[in-house]
């Protein structure tokens, strides 16, 4: 595996870290890989280390090329600068897809808390939208004004071109109310966008992957919260296709929830919405 750190904006300290795995050779069934771009949380005041590399590693293990974006924060988070950082990162990733052995149309985004807001914005209003979005305890409605007064509601931006989404959150999150996740799901439903959602009965804000390395020893949370990691990886295979069979297979779950909107759609996906 290779690691490369690229400065996207020196003045705003915006960097993209690429974790790149080999293809072919011993990975004979993998000529290229899908990718995922990680957007850590931190209230637009920082990019949390707990939601950066610890999140990247499970997706690396699942076979993805993984990228971590440290976007504009604090005074530099004036909107739309964080979204411009995302677009610059996605531009670069797609422009180097051949070099980095990537499927350029199979790049997802994952974000947490304020990073989840940015991931939601990427899914709904970016110049270069991702193929899929994973939103963890994300601030998606007007609550975002509490950490970044210039940032828009993502709920209001959902449209027919929004990509499929996977959402997870805790019912007892005391920082980002669960209404953010619910309202975003409702907006996706109104536009017939395919989604999967997991709202856990109890747990704190900012649980990341839930490993002991990223949690306080006395953290009280639902035992099933760590399942979101494996569930999201399985969901990505549903919406992007499988890549370990010599080429990308056809997705089993389409962009839209209605079978009338697509040439293919799985029964399981339809019944899960």
PLM features: residue spans?
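Conserved alpha/beta-hydrolase "acid-adjacent" motif
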Residues: 174-183
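Catalytic nucleophile-loop/oxyanion-hole region of alpha/beta-hydrolase
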Residues: 48, 69-104, 223
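Short beta-strand element of the alpha/beta-hydrolase
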Residues: 32-41
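Short beta-strand/loop motif that positions the catalytic acidic residue
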Residues: 161, 167-169, 173
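Short amphipathic alpha-helix adjacent to the substrate-entry channel of hydrolases
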Residues: 49-67
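Primarily recognizes the serine-hydrolase "nucleophile elbow" in alpha/beta-hydrolase
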Residues: 88-160, 249-250, 254
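N-terminal cap/lid segment of alpha/beta-hydrolase-fold proteins
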Residues: 1-31, 83
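C-terminal catalytic histidine-bearing segment of alpha/beta-hydrolase fold enzymes
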Residues: 193-273
